[in-house]
Amino acid sequence: MELFWSIVFTVLLSFSCRGSDWESDSNFISAAGPLTTDLLLSLQYPQGNQTSDFAAGGKDLYVCSQPLPAFLPEYFSSLRASEITHYKVFLSWAQLLPAGHSGDPDGNAVRCYRQLLEALRAAQLQPMVVLHHQHLPASSALRSAVFADLFAEYATFAFHAFGDLVGVWLTFSDLEAAIRELPQPESRASRLQLLTEAHRKAYEIYHQKYAAQGGKVSVVLQAEEISELLLESSTSALAKDSIDFLSLDLSYECQSEMSLPEKLSKLQTIEPKVKVFIFTLRLQDCPSSRKSPASLLFSFIEAINKDQVLTLGFDVNAFLNCSSTSKKSISCFLTDSLALQTDHERAARNSAPVSTYQRVWEMFAHQPRAERDAFLQDTFPQGFLWGVSTGAFNVEGGWAEGGRGPSVWDQFGHLKAAQGQATPEVASDSYYKWASDVALLRGLRAQVYKFSISWSRIFPMGRGSSPSPQGVAYYNKLIDSLLDSHIEPMATLFHWDLPQALQDEGGWQNESVVDAFVDYAAFCFSAFGNRVKLWVTFHEPWVMSYAGYGTGQHAPGISDPGIASFQVAHLVLKAHARTWHHYNSHHRPQQQGRVGIVLNSDWAEPLSPERPEDLAASERFLHFMLGWFAHPIFVDGDYPATMKAQIQQRNEQCPSPVAQLPEFTDTEKQLLKGSADFLGLSHYTSRLISKAPEDSCIPSYDTIGGFSQHTDPAWPQTSSPWIRVVPWGIRRLLQFVSLEYTKGKVPIYLAGNGMPIGESENLLSDSLRVDYFNQYINEVLKAIKEDSVDVRSYIARSLMDGFEGPAGYSQRFGLYHVNFNESSKPRTPRKSAFLLTSIIEKNGFLTKAVKQPLPPNSAHLPSKTRASALPSEVPSKAKVVWEKFSNQTKFERDLFYHGTFRDDFLWGVSSSAYQIEGAWDADGKGPSIWDNFTHTPGNGVTDNSTGDIACDSYNQLDADLNVLRALKVKAYRFSLSWSRIFPTGTNSSINSHGVDYYNRLIDGLLASDIFPMVTLFHWDLPQALQDIGGWENPSLIDLFDSYADYCFQTFGDRVKFWITFNEPTYYSWWSYGSGTFPPNVNDPGWAPYRISHALIKAHARVYHTYDEKYRQSQNGVISLSLVAQWAEPKSPDVLRDVEAADRKMQFTLGWYAHPIFKTGDYPDAMKWKVGNRSELQHLATSRLPSFTEEEKSYIRGTADVFCLNTYSSKIVQHKTPALNPPSYEDDQELAEEEDTSWPTTAMNRAASFGMRRLLNWIKEEYGDIPIYITENGVGLTNPRLEDIDRIFYYKTYINEALKAYRLDGVNLRGYFAWSLMDNFEWLQGYTIKFGLYHVDFENVNRPRTARISASYYTELITNNGMPLPSEDEFVYGQFPEGFVWSTSTAAFQIEGAWRADGKGLGIWDTFTHTRLKIENDDIADVACDSYHKISEDVVALQNLAVTHYRFSISWSRILPDGTTNYINEAGLNYYVRLIDALLAANIKPQVTMYHFDLPQALQDVGGWENETIVQRFKEYADVLFQRLGDKVKFWITLNEPFVVAYHGYGTGLYAPGIYFRPGTAPYIVGHNLIKAHAEAWHLYNDVYRASQGGVISITISSDWAEPRDPSNQEDVEAAKRYVQFMGGWFAHPIFKNGDYNEVMKTQIRERSLAAGLNESRLPEFTESEKRRINGTYDFFGFNHYTTVLAYNFNYPSIMSTVDADRGVASIVDRSWPGSGSYWLKMTPFGFRRILNWIKEEYNNPPIYVTENGVSHRGDSYLNDTTRIYYLRSYINEALKAVQQDKVDLRGYTVWTLMDNFEWYTGFSDKFGLHFVNYSDPSLPRIPRESAKFYASIVRCNGFPDPAEGPHPCLLQPEDTDPTMSPVSQEEVQFLGLSLGSTEAETALYVLFSLMLLGVCGLAFLSYALCKSSKQRKKLSQQELSPVSSF
């Protein structure tokens, strides 16, 4: 046969070569190809010895995907051996240039086609490349007007990318198909003209720019269309002008009467003569008896070559056959007969076509088990996406947060339909833990995260034009965080959780839901599509249709398999199609995303393969499960024929229809067909399928489908009854999907695969799941590599455990275990998480990890520096630090500073080898001194623990890398175990296993983009070296140098930051001085100095080794980590204490730093003290060794950077200790203590201010050297995950470091938290926890779980510090015109005259005269004596320029016994005179009727617990309205009823001091207070309002509450309860509905019943009372001072108090500035938030802030900067609430006008804008600076913008001197100077003016800079401003 074809080609060549000038192709062209999916399938999975059909027409073209099928080279070689010269390759424009233009090519596609072309060239086949066959890019840019230009751009791209491999180019292979693809409004002729122009441009570009490549260009034409094309000049270019040869698509019917010469006659009309190539040859009806291939070809040649038309070659596919008997043998040949290729015989052969399912099943049916289960060691294609998934209702929780509406799954949970009556209300709490979830993803190294959007979180009712802002914000934060972590978001629009509101309308059985879904999707595309590029419309719609509406097992629980199930699917498909088309039309052009659908399917194997009916049932099963949705979308727009036929048959067999399958209209079919950019596939398990045993007419999924489902008992079982482990099923399913649906045109995204474990199983060691993932993922790899299936992703289910529908929380799918019993819902990685990470890192299954290239020096390390040889001083020059900082006020010291660190700041965490590694004797490691010590009984370790296992980091490397990535750290500081590398301590015993561990750790860090910082020695000396004397043996210096040299040589190519010793100060003292650490040498006077001497020399030796041998090639830095506590002098003004503090610094930090960073020698302070004390001890020489001059020179400058470990501070004073016995500690001659006000920790008190001072001291002492804080952290004894104290520690300490950097110019380069995780903390064992991650030491796997501090630290890293949040930025502006400015007081607190003029006793009179009730036994008998000082008070008010004055009336001064039996006219007259004086001063009165001071006579009959008081209060109010109402237009009934009820009758802190009925009395009192208010309001409203025209309301008080942990839903709920119990207790009945809020009613009722009561302790209002109470307000009076951090606290049920009912405990943030009151922290942000809460909760009522202020304690504090800060900040937040949030705020009142009697604290807490000098009998009111500041705000009505120039309101009038007795001039500390108050006042004015000028200048400069560049970089180190933080 080969001889036959050789003769034929020889003859053909003689025809073709006559006159040929195509020298490069002088041989006859015989062309095969292109590749099709069917061809690849037949070659790969031969069935018997059958030959493959190579006709290309009608086949699905192969879309290039990597890797190329492995058998292609053999196939190509076989073609070349069969005389084939060329092979057709069809490029995909849409694949190469998805956007249509060359600006963003698909690199993977380019590489793939190049590999294909190179494979052809390697087989000596010439590629014949077609630029476009079908499928234009999906881009709006492909408009008619620019099509030709875009095609030319594409052609240019192809010529450039592939031209070196291609000699023959064809622009179009099917003009008709291309015409149909162009925009339809154009006529066919104009579209053909467009194609002609596109071809012409491509032709010209090739010959102008790429002619040197020597190729030819043409276009494929239908032979019958030649004449038509030649007639039109506009298209003739296609046939003769713009082609190098004519390429024809030729069909020939052998039986046709028309001869070839007639058919090709038009070829002769083309001038000049062109060469002809038959690109496609189709033979029809050519029986073998008629013609041989040779005769047929000769007749073609004769017809074409007539009149010198030259034939170049033919398409020989018609004559080509290949056979393949096994995968290893492919044979292609040209047949000598046409019989094999005749249509007639082909039709006969295929009379019973084999279905896709049957073909796929037959591919694998006879596969031996060993071959089936063989593990493939290979990698996935480049660009393959790895990820994990979740669903909204599975993990989010927050079911009612942010206005979210309920979904069908919420309803399902509330009906207690899930196992264990579980609900998804909290689930995994991802709504609040999105940042933690993204951290988990980083830990996994996930590249894509598939999550779903909760429809009802966006649109609570399913519809509407107003989406929930909170819901949108949640997804924005999640998406932005994913992208910031380089994780691709894949957003699912619908994951089974239909809004319940839509379900109430019929759900997916109501056609209108389609419109609602499209609207919802359209919003999501608009809101998130600029960042989300992968969209899933529906996730597993089969599950919802089958289980939600078929079996009823899922929400919404409808059981109607015959009708509802099919209705739902029908509407889902229509919703999907419309959504896809909406995206395609409206969003794709701009967003360039992809929209698909995720379908789930099991694989189906016939139960009895020998039974055809089982085979048919298996295929039917797939069509019912997968084809139900896939066939309409990916095939023809309609349901599978098999499915339709089966349902029809079943309905015909039954007396009534069993199922109703809706029909699509033709329009709907067109809409559905092709409506997906990818097919997402979920797969979990496989089934054995048989034909249903009998035809049942009872509708069910199986009976309708006619099949029965089974499993093989041999298949491993999981905890889920429906999932068996059948890995090979996924490969078969992927092959089926590829051939049946995607056909190489649409990529497959594997979007769901996983298995659960049960609650009773090992929740962390999920070995079965590890095997599951390993095997299933490997089968996916086989599908890609061996079956050429185009799979683009693997997405595991699930990221973490969640709510699993009917199974509740019993089925755990998570790679991360979630502890649902903990309120914080902590996540802990399972073994399967580490497996998946390993696969991701290797991109598959490699036996060895890929060697990573060396990373760039990402840490931006400083260059080598040299120390200065400055002489020492005693005390050192660093004493300026104490001078600068020690006299700061607490407010100045602790005020929080906002800013960021340098851009290359190195954020990291630390650990050390012995503390975490474990494996103490594994793999040849030698023992260390700590191994020996901990194994010795009585060693002093607290819990008798050892580091034998510790965190097991030696065996848990994957776990450590996981948490490091999750933290987002840039660097990891760890130490090497000397005895793990050199077991005996010397280089004669190198342990390769230990070296390998550190290599893997370092490589893993670098692969995770984490910079390694390596410590050579962290206290764990090899025991073998200790046995020869340890560091007291001089040879240790050489041995340490040898060890370091080996480390530099082995790891230095990747490690660029080395630390020789960690904390040598502590090591030398604890190990050789106190003897508490090994080697336990107790020699306090001598050994520490000797050891330190050796360590310093050892360090210097190693430094020089690195400097001389490695620095030039490795380019790293080297130093040592020194430790120090800040020393604060007890009396900063006492020189001896300052010297003692400096001495402590020199004896600890300077001991090592001074020789290394300064002079090469010890500090003079040390030499002096130790030398003198040695002499006094009668020693011949100093106990402190000395260095030779040579050693000093060698030591000096042996560190490139300064590494500092610091944890705490000490207060130091001079002390003269005993001389003997000698001791390093006594040599320092000082005493240490800690301030008891500093927060406690497990080891030392926290004193964050010391951080800034210590950094400044280093700068002053050692110069501007780069500093790295290599350890800082806090130990806690409580192992809980909610380590809020650790957050406070880091927050305050790092803020002080930030101040040092930004304000003081300290050259700070990095910060490392101690520690990454809990570990062995030396003598404390495992009792103290320093870790950001909790380690469970009781669990053999030592799982690591993130604490909330880990999330906080990640946030710091993300923000690179503590930038000022945009919402906290100061705003300029003015309040609305008419805004009320006021100040307030209360009668009892200021009036005095407690028994004057007939005043009756009040409860506070009684209370203050009772011992132990008031601080300092203060009484208010005189107070401020305002009863006698009306004029002084009015002057004070005028100082403030206020428009209003809020004061209260003393009930017992008007009605001495509380009743109207007697009205005290003298008392009433006081208020008349006061009001008249106010009005005369143009100040309007705001009168509070009741401010805590109940007449004692009423208290004697029960007070507010007696319901008669309601009437008494109404009568009292009536007197006030009658007598004062003509002058008072602003009334407040009650002030802070919460305080009256809670503190007066609950805690007993306030009068009347009742505390023994805390669970009932406060509620009774509150009940009566509300009714009394309502009665007073109605009285005024009904009787007086018309004539007096005033307003009346109540003043409510409330703190704002923030959740302690904002990521914990329990804490969020607790914060809400806190506010509802405080502010809502009284506001809700009055401002909302006349009744208590539901939170209170529910809480109190449930706790009352739990305590055994029959009813709630909270009284109930009758319906008439509710109506009377509701709406009894004209405004919302509001008092606010501070904010708390709230968290859930479960009190015992027997405890009946308001606090217990509330179920909340509260703390405060340590960084919040304090005040004179323990309960009041300055939190201005909370003011704005609670004003917004009032707006939202009570429909934006008019609000008057009736109290707001801050206290101090101590002296007069005239220059009260603290109060100015408070007022400025709080009032500015109020301005934001008005301007930005549209809160209806009408007025602001500062508390208080003047210092007064502050209830149970007496006169200790001072809130006044005026100082009242109680030591002066005249009680003068002296204005503080805050009074003047407040007056300026009042006059300016806010904060005028300085950028607009000086405002007239800032021009202050002359001060009015108040009437007062002479006061002595007091001294004021101002900016470190002692000034008189007058001078300080003048200085403050000057400073204030300068500040205003500075602010104006700064504003102008900021505007100019912002205008010039929006992207201005942060200040460099040289640009930092040393301004104060205040």
From Swiss-Prot:
Keywords: Cell membrane, Glycoprotein, Glycosidase, Hydrolase, Membrane, Multifunctional enzyme, Signal, Transmembrane, Transmembrane helix, Zymogen. It catalyses: lactose + H2O = beta-D-galactose + D-glucose; phlorizin + H2O = phloretin + beta-D-glucose; D-cellobiose + H2O = beta-D-glucose + D-glucose; quercetin 4'-O-beta-D-glucoside + H2O = quercetin + beta-D-glucose. Its EC number is 3.2.1.108, 3.2.1.62. Residues 900-1364 are annotated as: Glycosyl hydrolase-1 3. Residues 20-866 form a propeptide. Residues 20-1882 are extracellular. InterPro entries: Glyco_hydro_1 (IPR001360), Glyco_hydro_1_AS (IPR018120), Glyco_hydro_1_N_CS (IPR033132), Glycoside_hydrolase_SF (IPR017853). Specifically expressed in small intestine. GO terms for cellular component: external side of apical plasma membrane. Residues 1224-1236 have a biased composition (Acidic residues). It is an enzyme of class 3 (hydrolase). Residues 1-19 form the signal peptide. Homodimer. This is Lactase/phlorizin hydrolase. It comes from Oryctolagus cuniculus (Rabbit). The lineage of its organism: Eukaryota, Metazoa, Chordata, Craniata, Vertebrata. The gene is LCT.
